[in-house]
Design a protein with these regions (language model features):
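Sec-dependent signal peptide recognition
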Residues: 2-10
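Detector for small/aliphatic-rich hydrophobic stretches
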Residues: 7, 20-167
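Hydrophobic h-region of N-terminal signal peptides that target proteins for export
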Residues: 12-19
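Non-catalytic, conformational "gating/processing" segments within enzyme and secreted inhibitor domains
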Residues: 71, 88, 111-272, 295-373
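Extracytoplasmic/secreted cell-surface and envelope-processing proteins
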Residues: 94-99, 277-278, 309-311, 361, ...
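Short Gly/aromatic-enriched secondary-structure transition segments
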Residues: 99-102, 218-224, 279-288
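Extended hydrophobic
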Residues: 253-269, 374-409
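Internal alpha/beta scaffold segment
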Residues: 271-296
Length: 409
């Protein structure tokens, strides 16, 4: 199975890491979004607690838009702004403001840890034969701007931070990006039209690639919503003795299970039979799970799947916070703050979930049972109806997915 992970870095104003200009302050306050002044109050306290609260709040703010959408598979990313911010740090040596504001002792390690997670680096030790699996990583794509013009030194900084990177001009970005992905990264993908501003620069980057990703694959029989059983490649969860335990929580009208995927986890929220998907309060389910989940034994397989959907997250952000342009101000030094003006970015979500990780929109069908009787009872978890899935990095929700029609890859 070819890796198909695709990153578009967007400004989703439901999650704000930095300051905003005064005229937009009241709009941010209405949504309980973290602003520069609030972050200052949080210094030398618990690590970025307001920042995480803002991410959780965004689950409610943005998912409310789904009530007006046609039924179907949808995705949004409350963490998109964080990814954009992390990429800025890749081309700037000015990390002290970031460190001070979020109380992070090693911002470079924090950023690289996040980007490594998003790019699917994984190491699995199998007890059977001690196989070490290093999963192939993916490239990401971004357009930040209406102006994205890092100077030469900053472009060189980007190239040194990643194993490989490329910068294209606007007029030829499609052909240049295709050449970059094919020849340098080794991925064949269709580069989307993003209609960039003429003053923009498009940046592409990739991390280390490993080609022994097939070592962790297994096969399993799964039954999608159409009722036709299908045998597909899958990534194991737990182990064949069923001795590993993962977080599980039974809510008022749903159950929720956390599944480790690479450095991230996929947390599936499955409504009870007869419960409409929209009757689930995502934010409450998220917080209840974090506070009350219990470890239960688990063994099974998660199949590979993929969907494609084009989403304009700029439009979504405008609905949440109309006419608000998010930009860096006091937290950045003068020589870098003008490099980040995040506007009008289209996300083209070509999403896949596999042993490489989770990115974009998730569709999962899953059956889990025990290999033999255990001291602790198993929780059988069958995803045979519409559900939510949250891809998380620690306690930070990266992608929230509404799945109505699961489709195998």
């Amino acid at each position: 199975m070819k890796i198909r992970k695709f990153f578009t870095l967007v400004s989703l104003s439901a999650l704000v890491l930095t300051g905003c200009n005064k005229e937009n302050q009241s709009q941010f306050e209405k949504l309980n979004i973290v602003t520069n002044d609030e972050l200052k109050k949080e210094r030398n306290k618990e690590k970025a607690s307001l920042y995480l609260d803002s991410a959780r709040q965004s689950l409610q703010d943005v998912s409310a838009l789904w009530t007006n959408r046609e039924p179907g598979n949808h995705v949004f990313s409350p963490a998109s702004y964080l990814v954009a911010w992390s990429s800025l740090l890749a081309v700037s040596s000015q990390t002290d403001a970031y460190q001070e504001a979020l109380c992070i002792s090693d911002p470079k390690a924090e950023r690289l840890g996040l980007l490594s997670s998003l790019n699917g680096i994984e190491k699995n030790n199998w007890d059977d034969d001690q196989i070490l699996t290093s999963i192939k990583t993916a490239a990401f794509y971004q357009q930040i701007g209406n102006k994205y013009a890092f100077d030469k030194k900053k472009q060189e900084k980007l190239a040194s931070e990643y194993v490989d990177s490329g910068v294209t001009d606007v007029d030829h970005y499609l052909s240049q990006a295709q050449e970059y992905f094919t020849e340098k990264i080794g991925l064949k993908r269709q580069i989307p039209e993003v209609f960039p501003d003429k003053d923009s620069v498009l940046v592409y980057g990739g991390l280390t690639r490993k080609d022994n990703a097939d070592l962790g694959k297994r096969s399993g029989a799964f039954t999608p919503l159409n009722g036709v059983e299908k045998t597909v490649d899958a990534v194991p969860i737990g182990n064949r003795w069923g001795t590993e335990s993962f977080e599980y929580y039974k809510g008022e009208n749903y159950q929720r299970r956390s599944l480790p995927i690479c450095s991230t986890s996929l947390e599936v929220i499955l409504p009870d039979e007869g419960t409409d998907l929209k009757d689930i309060d995502i934010k409450k389910a998220y917080l209840d799970f974090k506070e009350n989940a219990c470890l239960t034994p688990l063994y099974g397989y998660v199949p590979f799947f993929k969907t494609e959907e084009r989403i304009d997250l700029t439009t979504i952000a405008d609905k949440v916070n109309s006419d608000c342009v998010v930009f860096c101000s006091e937290l950045l030094k003068d020589d870098v703050k003008n490099d980040l003006g995040i506007r009008n970015v289209i996300q083209n979500s070509d999403f896949s979930f596999s042993d490489k990780g989770v990115e974009g929109e998730s569709i999962t069908i899953m059956e889990i049972g025990s290999a033999r009787p255990q001291k602790h009872p198993y929780t059988e978890f069958n995803v045979n109806r519409p559900f939510y899935a949250i891809s998380s990095y620690g306690s930070l929700p990266l992608f929230v997915n509404q799945i109505v029609d699961p489709v195998f890859n």
